[in-house]
Design a protein with these regions (language model features):
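Intrinsically disordered, low-complexity N-terminal segments that are enriched in acidic
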Residues: 18-116
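Active-site nucleophilic cysteine motif
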Residues: 166-170, 202-217
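A short, structured loop/turn motif at beta-sheet edges
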Residues: 47-49, 98-103, 161-163, 218-220, ...
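Acidic low-complexity segments
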Residues: 97-200
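Secretory targeting signatures
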Residues: 1-30, 56, 263, 330
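Short intrinsically disordered coil segments
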Residues: 71-75, 121-133, 277-282
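Hydrophobic/aromatic-rich core segments of domains that either
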Residues: 211-307
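TerminUS-proximal long segments
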Residues: 300-330
Length: 330
């Protein structure tokens, strides 16, 4: 009964999310559907020399037009569900831990994801209204739309009369300039775009690629935001992350960790469409595979996206993350 209550409460909270976040289904072709059972666990350690009372924020898979999410269980049981200003839903657990005590948090989710592609013949896109522009084209810490170099490149390579053509041109340019390497920090668009002997390149991982694309799209008047979650290589996977070895692993962590970030843009009549250029190193404008699991959106807040956003303690230390994905096609 308790698990059913958790599911019901989460659904009621998520249903309150603004319709704008789900987007439109006009001109969109939905194809395969995959149902995942996701089991996760997070190891927290109290490294302080006193007992701590900690509120731990647990990222939950979100509901979108192409993803339905259900919480089947969380232990310890959450004291509440909370929505942030970007519309993301978190479970909040209250933990009391003695000095050096280790505590596991266990979660189980059911997530149904649909692959989709937009029908580009349906529309060239319509430029957004003022409210969307105001919210989704502003400058932020990592998306500096006042950087004249970034803005000039965006206009040179992607300025067109139609938003969809602009996004497609921009995606082609960005994916052709990627110098991929794991970045445990976050450079932001100002520092991710560098000039080399081969011209401008984007140095970093999925976060830097997304940051540069979002900044350029916003500078061109296209509403854009970041999405964080997972990109799987198959429907059944075991993924884990040991925070104590991340620094030394480098690109080796990609063999067992698929935490991911990618951009979304808003183009009427399609609504929010994904642009994951690192899925097969292709522009992928409005082409989305069911190997993605969405855990949240970045519009104004920043959680670390690809690494630590799964579980966010206030005073304790996150030491280990483990996920098992069991997906069934059909």
């Amino acid at each position: 009964m308790r698990n059913k209550a958790v599911v019901l409460l989460l659904l009621l909270v998520i249903l309150a999310i603004n319709v704008e976040q789900s987007g439109s289904l006009g001109g969109v072709n939905v194809s395969s559907r995959v149902t995942y059972t996701i089991k996760g666990r997070f190891l927290l350690v109290n490294t302080n020399n006193i007992t701590v009372n900690d509120y731990v924020y647990i990222s939950l898979p979100q509901n979108t037009s192409f993803q339905q999410s259900f919480v089947l269980g969380i232990e310890p049981s959450p004291v509440r569900f909370q929505r942030d200003e970007d519309g993301n839903i978190f479970a909040v657990a209250y933990i009391v831990a003695k000095p050096q005590e280790k505590i596991w948090i266990n979660v189980t989710y059911k997530v149904v994801v649909s692959s989709y592609s937009i029908d580009t013949s349906a529309s060239k896109g319509v430029w957004p209204n003022f409210l969307l522009l105001k919210k989704y084209t502003s400058s932020t810490r990592y998306w500096d739309i006042y950087n004249t170099t970034v803005v000039k490149i965006a206009y040179d390579v992607a300025y067109t009369s139609y938003p969809l053509a602009t996004v497609e041109s921009l995606a082609r340019w960005v994916v052709s300039r990627v110098n991929y390497n794991v970045n445990l920090g976050r450079s932001g668009s100002d520092h991710a775009l560098i000039y080399t002997s081969r011209g401008y390149r984007i140095q970093g991982d999925c976060v830097e690629v997304a940051d540069v694309f979002i900044t350029m799209a916003r500078s061109l008047g296209v509403p854009a935001r970041g999405v964080y979650g997972f990109l799987l290589t198959s429907y059944k996977e075991h993924q884990w992350l040991n925070m104590s070895t991340v620094q030394s692993e480098g690109e080796g962590l990609l063999t067992h960790w698929g935490g991911h970030m990618w951009p979304e843009v808003y183009v009427d009549p399609y609504g929010w469409i994904d642009v994951d250029m690192l899925d097969g190193m292709s522009p992928n404008v409005g082409v989305f595979s069911a190997r993605h699991i969405v855990f949240g959106f970045e519009e104004t807040k920043y959680y670390g996206a690809a690494l630590t956003s799964s579980c966010i303690p206030s005073y304790m230390t996150l030491e280990y993350i483990d996920y098992i994905f069991e997906g069934e096609l059909g």
